[in-house]
Amino acid sequence: MSEDTALVVGLGNPGPQYEKTRHNVGFMVAGVLSARMGGKFSAHKKSGAEIVQGRFEGRPTILAKPRSFMNLSGSAVAGLARFFSVDPGNIVVIHDELDLDFGTIRLKQGGGEGGHNGLRSISSALGTKDYLRTRVGIGRPPGRMDPASYVLKPFSSVERKELDLVCEESADAVELVLRVGLEAAQNRLH
């Protein structure tokens, strides 16, 4: 990626009742990145997000968590992109991914949203799907459980034992893509 400002967005739902749910893994990874940046999230009134402003290896970086529910997060992401003049190619969205086994991390640019309404909202608000994604696997729901219910449930006790490591590795993946770009990061991770 270039030296232009990077916008890194962790997706999740606001409120303590969602804090430990699968859908909030993007917020969890953003928390790890915030600690690494040495910053604390604060409200950015013009966008409807909480942000940390800092530098990653000298590059201006905005770390964000939209304060709206995930399905409406596009407004905050587009607002931040406009306010900080960030091109969609310099946006990295961290989100939960049903189609990957728990703990699997994949990087991707553009493409479909795979039924993820948070991504759909962002694509619509930005007017493009051409932004980077850090996909954090949460696995498929068991049996016939509705995926919409599954993503709003807490991680299992077995998953919770590995969750901190998954969030650390996901943060590593975000930092890698910021450092070396998508293709080189994919070659190292995949």
From Swiss-Prot:
- tRNA-binding as a keyword of this entry, yes or no, is yes
User: What does the record give as EC number?
Assistant: 3.1.1.29
Top EC class for this record? hydrolase
Question: What CDD domains does the annotation carry?
Answer: PTH
Active site (UniProt): 23
Give the molecular function GO annotations: peptidyl-tRNA hydrolase activity; tRNA binding
**Which positions are annotated as binding tRNA?**
18, 69, 71, 117
InterPro entries from the UniProt entry: Pept_tRNA_hydro, Pept_tRNA_hydro_CS, Pept_tRNA_hydro_sf
Any one GO CC term of this protein is: cytoplasm
Family stated for the protein in its record = Belongs to the PTH family.
Q: Report quaternary structure and partners.
A: Monomer.
| Annotated function | Hydrolyzes ribosome-free peptidyl-tRNAs (with 1 or more amino acids incorporated), which drop off the ribosome during protein synthesis, or as a result of ribosome stalling.
Q: What name has this protein been given in UniProt?
A: Peptidyl-tRNA hydrolase
Give the organism the record lists: Rhodococcus jostii (strain RHA1)
User: Which lineage is the organism of this entry classified under, starting from the top rank?
Assistant: Bacteria, Bacillati, Actinomycetota, Actinomycetes, Mycobacteriales
**Gene designation:** pth
